[in-house]
């Protein structure tokens, strides 16, 4: 009973602090837009934000988190103007829920999944592992990090990959889960997991952390494509900065930044 009460109190505190944070940024300022961004895209959105703000007088406020949590927060009334999801399903669901503008959804990036095996390199050459080598190394790893498949599309892709390889049940007891792909990266980089699955863009964004490690560029046919969609929320229907950023995301300048970060588009 005590455990239940403590869990309930913790949940209430989390909701309280989230509410306080959103209350501070929720003012209807026509010169700013609040963008909810999936964790894998945080580093890239920072580059896009700088470029966008040099071209427009308005300001972007970035709120990061797992796709599942951001979706839940929007449903609970969080004042987010644009949702940059790591999947297609949740933006579509927001439209079905009547919270997003019909026809505003589009794919802004297609993610790539890689297997990361720290300290396993015998020389230079990232992404040099074969599928067979990766499977053998995974089987010899005591802890393998994946993002939560229920909250993070990269976690779902990782689970699907292991199922395709026939390894999910075998490795199940050794799997540790991060809430999002950022926490998964931290589990591996800190040594709390010997191997795991991250986004290609994370490896490119943190060369100092992964410079001597080995990778397998996952075969994209072994999991559902990680198509990442954006959608405009109804609260921002007349927000000029939100409208401008949605248009900017489709521009050649933005797409070049997104490609350089390790995404397809």
What label would you give each PLM region?
Residues 11-22:
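Bacterial N-terminal signal peptides
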Residues 84:
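Short active-site segment of divalent metal-dependent hydrolases/proteases
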Residues 1-6:
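N-terminal secretory signal peptides that target proteins for export/translocation
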Residues 8-10, 92:
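Composition-driven detection of intrinsically disordered, low-complexity segments
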Residues 24-64, 68, 72-78, 87-88, ...:
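Exported/periplasmic ABC-transporter solute-binding proteins
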């Amino acid at each position: 009973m005590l455990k239940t009460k403590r869990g309930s109190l913790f949940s209430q505190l989390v909701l309280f602090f989230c509410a306080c944070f959103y209350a501070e940024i929720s003012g209807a300022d026509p010169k700013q837009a609040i963008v909810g961004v999936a964790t894998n895209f945080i580093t890239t959105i920072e580059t896009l934000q700088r470029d966008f703000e040099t071209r427009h007088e308005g300001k972007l406020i970035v709120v990061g988190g797992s796709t599942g949590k951001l979706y839940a927060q929007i449903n609970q009334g969080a004042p987010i103007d644009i949702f940059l999801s790591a999947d297609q399903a949740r933006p579509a669901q927001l439209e079905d829920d009547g919270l997003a503008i019909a026809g505003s959804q589009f794919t802004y990036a297609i993610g790539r999944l890689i297997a990361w095996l720290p300290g396993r390199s015998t020389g230079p050459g990232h992404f040099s592992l074969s599928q067979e080598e990766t499977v053998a190394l995974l089987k010899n790893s005591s802890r393998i990090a994946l993002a939560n498949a229920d909250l993070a599309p990269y976690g779902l892709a990782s689970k699907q990959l292991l199922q395709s390889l026939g390894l999910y049940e075998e490795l199940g007891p050794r799997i540790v889960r991060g809430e999002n792909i950022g926490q998964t990266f931290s589990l591996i980089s800190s040594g709390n997991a010997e191997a795991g699955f991250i986004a290609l863009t994370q490896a490119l964004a943190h060369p100092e952390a992964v410079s001597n490690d080995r990778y397998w560029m996952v075969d994209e046919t072994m999991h559902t494509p990680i198509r990442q969609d954006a959608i405009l929320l109804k609260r921002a229907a007349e927000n000029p900065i939100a409208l401008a950023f949605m248009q900017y995301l489709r521009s050649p300048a933005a797409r070049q930044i997104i490609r350089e970060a390790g995404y397809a588009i």
